[in-house]
Amino acid sequence: MKILYSLLLISSIILNTVLNISSQVYDQRILALKGKCYLDSNKNALYDEGEPGFGNVEISLGNATDYKGNKYPIRYSSADGTFIYDGLTQRTTYEFTFTNPKDYYFETYEKTLACPPGVPCIRPTVSADNLAADLLVANTFAYNIPLIKQVGVSSGSSILTVRISVDLGYVEQTQPPTQPPTQPPTQPPTPPPFTGSAVAGLLFTDINGNGIFDGRDVWTSNVSVGLYNFNDKTRALDVNGNVISSITTDANGRYAFENVANGVYCLWMEGTKYFNPGCVGRIEINSATMPKSVASDGVQSPTILRAGSFSLFLTGNSGYGGYAYNDIDLNGYLSSRDQGIAGIIVKIYLPVYNFLFGTVTTDSNGRWSFSGLQPGFPVRIEFVIPNDFTSTGANLVNFVTVGQSIDLSIGLIPKSLTGVNAGPSNPKSFVTTCFVKGSYNGKYKDEPTVVEINKDAQGKAYAQQSADYMKVLASHKDTGSVHGVAFNPDNGDKFVSSYHKTNSDFGPSGSCAIYKLSSGIITTHVNFNDVFGKSYCGGYAHYFDFREISTAGPLVGKASLGQMTYYNKKLYVTNLGKNEILVVPIYQNPNATNVERIPVANPGCSSGDDWHIFPVTVFQGELFTGGVCSGEKGSRLSTYILKYNPNSKSFSTVLFYTLGYARGCRYLDSFGSCVSSVWQKWSNNDSPQALLSTIIFDVSGHLIMAYKDRSGDISAVVSAPELLIACLGTDGLFYLESGGKCGSLVGAGVDQKSLTGLRYGPGNGNFFDNHKTGLHDYTNAFGATKGGRDIIVTTGFDYYEAFEGSIRWYNATSGKQLKGYSLYITSSNGRTPSPTFGKQNGLGDITSVYDSSLPQYRVGRVWLDINGNGIQDAGEPGISGITVFLIYGQQSTPTSQTVSDSNGYFKFEVDFSSNYYCVIPVAFFQAGSSITMRNADPTHPNTNSDAFLSTVDNVYVTSFTSSDAGGYYFNGCSFGIIPKK
């Protein structure tokens, strides 16, 4: 049976069905067509078990009559959504028109050329059908009509047209013979010769479910084997038109069918203590191309298909179980607050044949279980969850071994509670730090050191009309000098960390502390000097006199703490005194046992004394840091960006570049000459010195790097900070912007010129606009944070006026400044004392503040598709160690990369409602392997392979559109690899 579909218009679907059987005269049997209108609850354009039928849909058939010549009246789908048209004739084109009810519309759906496994597409009618027709056409996916609810849609605004024509071909003529009757033979008639083909094969008991005869497997006797037509699952006929009888396997598991006609068939296997997996295999007979049979085949047919061996699976008493629960705190594991969810469907599939073993549902406590299999047997377990729910981390598809005592549980949450309009892409405000002069308990003790800025801020906080945009969270007496800042979205707590700056005192807990700001209460979350010993971060006591610069200056960037970030209920902060990252728990009292210390070794500076780290961030679950070779001991001025491998406990370089590129002017002196910003080796002099202070990633995966001018924290009146971008290449390395461009992005400073008219920046350009017209070529960034989907927010100076401390909003894809807000202005006359630092790195780092959310993750898998069916079957292993690239939208460069784990899984954090591609170069796989079929089973998108081969770039590619809600999603990014033959 062959079914052909074609889609002509989005609102008009044309369906043509052709069923061909070769013979002599046209088949005249009358047909009935059965379909179903249903509410597509999960909007996957497929009818899934449990989705409700949709009644009262108007259906008309105006262009034809039934086989008696009667017109079909307008009718409506029944309460369960079904509709039946009786009395259809073959070779007639029928045009069905469906009219939508109010508040619903017809979904555009993909037609498939098959019925569900083991279900016939066409069958003879029976008396219980109460139909005039001889045959009933039903069950094909294409006859299920999906509707979607959308309030406001008017009735009749969505019209669906389905056109169908059926032709069953020819049948044998039935007229009586014209010759006289044949006289009875005097001896038994000679059987007709075998002119068809033989089909022979073996059955074996597959103990480990891998589809291969090995290990403890045995050949299986006394099992009934039937040959069926592949398409409609009816009994196969031989070349003489006779039904081919079932055969029982012999002691060696062998079976053989004789005289089989050309066609495509499958096997039906039934035996005591064995599962019947439905009609399995695809056995294609074409006698013209098949080999001749030989005596050892033991058959009489002239040609033979040696079908190989097929698996049989034993029944047993073992099973599996677990829970489905409402993950209230979005933490991905079952806790005391979480409650079980009843009614979640769990499906269990056997290996090799993708056969549904059984379906169970969770009870009132959220518990589910099944039994009936042998211990140690592999199965695939799928959770079918409501469309308005999402997983908080557990896989919807799982591959387990029967009999294990481990529960397989899944946490779920309504999508509406994942924080659709929350998260770092939707900040409400920003927190930054301000440096204050003098002792923390001196005359400026009440000056602000930590402030929160509203996302809508603009203007000048020091001017009354814009003051309401800024809120003071802490003062100098509370924290002293702090640079690092982090935010915990779970409870709204903010954290700031000590920083060493000349002329600005440490707070009451000294040089190595993290302070917590919680609902107006300021406490010391951890003092590392108490945990690990005095001067752990490098100690220093300020003099605040003529000795300050000479004694405090040399320790800038070498003592105290650097950048700090929050990730997964932990704080990550750099210890500048020891070139290490400290990982601090938030919900426990930090101590020497639970604070992790990660040393960051010199990656390549010619002298280890020249290696200085500062930034830290987490992107796609991976830890990054970086630093500079300072040149003090002769190493070349350069930058390293490093990624941590927790397995080897080591860092690898993902970006390296030197700092000798042309730079513009700090300012013009009184003679109009350029005061150079070219980076110099670290010293205690008033010269530009690169201190890599921040690394972050934008939504497109670009690496944003902020540099403080170290001299601004020592004595320089005007610092010259920098803001750079780098893009990820397909080799897994990042590449620094050049000429104001990064990959396919074109920045704001492609044609920029310095105050003296010269080109400057890496490759003579800068991606970000960093200048103050007529005053400075560099004004930021001391720190930076993601401020929205395509927004970067930075700290610097002089947005409106000279000697301001300012923050700026940037477009991350164009590098253009969008707006600014100034927090303070410092007196510049030299006579009026001021607590702030003007252009001398007066602000610290910055972080966004946002409502708690569950980020969105796309989970994929790379697996070995042993049987080549395009489906992730139980027993098929994942492929580990494969690098997968994520590409955002129409970018020409990757957004991120990751490596598949021991089970072949990988995941990417993605933005809402965005288009992405997952890409793997073909060269990453064994030569001779290939990609399996794509979208093999549209009804199970979570188990398909999604990839195709792009011959232009010789890569395997998948594509998907991310959801509009948080959670974990499992379709659109899987790769099935067929092994080398």
UniProtKB/Swiss-Prot annotation:
Entry-listed glycosylation sites: N63, N222, N591, N811
One annotated Gene Ontology cellular component of this protein: extracellular region
Location in the cell: Secreted
UniProt keyword list: Glycoprotein, Secreted, Signal
Main location class: secreted
Matches recorded under InterPro entries: Ig-like_fold, Sdr_B
Organism superkingdom: Eukaryota
Name of the protein in its database record: Colossin-C
Organism: Dictyostelium discoideum
